[in-house]
Amino acid sequence: MQTGELLGSGRSADVFAIDDHWVLRRYRDGGDVTAGAAVMAYLAEHGYPVPRLRGPAGAGHRTEPRTDLVMQRLHGPSMLQALLQGTITAEEAGARLADLLHRLHSVPARVSVDPANRILHLDLHPDNVMITSGGPVVIDWCNTEEGPPGLDWGMSALILAQVAAGNTAMAAPVRAVLASLLTCLGPTMAMGNTDSGCLTEARTRRAADPSMSESETHLLDDAMDLITELTPARP
């Protein structure tokens, strides 16, 4: 497929303009978009804010390579850009992330028969939320799977905490986003307890992520401590 302007690049994929309405997301290393596309189509049916897909999402109906996904072009800044521009506060960003997690976990699992399992994003942070005129839209579903909601909260918290524990200019605002997110935890999410299975599993996954830099990996222990510090006490 012929592509236009490169709009953005992540750790594993690039996004190209097709026209004013559609973009092409293409994996660089042979990744397969089929599973993520099926989840996005399912979530859209349940009213969750994801980009529209062009054409059927099922693997048997696809005409593009399995590395390519054609989806709605979203107009507006990412939540991270809005935070840096001052159009939303850190407290608002954290609350919106929490709301998106709560809404996602209210949708029944697509495949699992375990009633405790839900669809998980596993990479929900401010740069994966687009602020459009119609509201926030969640992008980048390449890591999605099904499991306990606490794992999704743990991954989001840990991603934020790694930035907040660093010494970059982003540390202070992201710390405030993290604090806001943690105040909105559900009553069963004991994320401040580093012995809880979900947060420990999140740390294990982050440590094993080959896309993380050595400096990011070294921040994991400090990030875990910061989550403990910022999580409000539960009754």
Question: How should each PLM-predicted stretch be described?
Answer:
Residues 4-36:
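ATP-binding glycine-rich loop module of kinase domains
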Residues 21, 68, 119, 136-137:
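Hydrophobic "anchor" residues on beta-strands that sit immediately upstream
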Residues 44-57:
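Conserved HxN/HPN-centered segment at the entrance to the catalytic loop
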Residues 44-47, 80-122, 127, 136:
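Conserved kinase catalytic-core helix
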Residues 55-97:
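Conserved structural core of kinase catalytic domains
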Residues 76, 158-235:
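Helix-rich C-terminal or lid/interface subdomains of diverse kinases
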Residues 129-131:
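Hydrophobic residue at the +6 position relative to the catalytic HRD Asp in the kinase catalytic loop
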Residues 135-173:
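Active-site Asp-x-Gly
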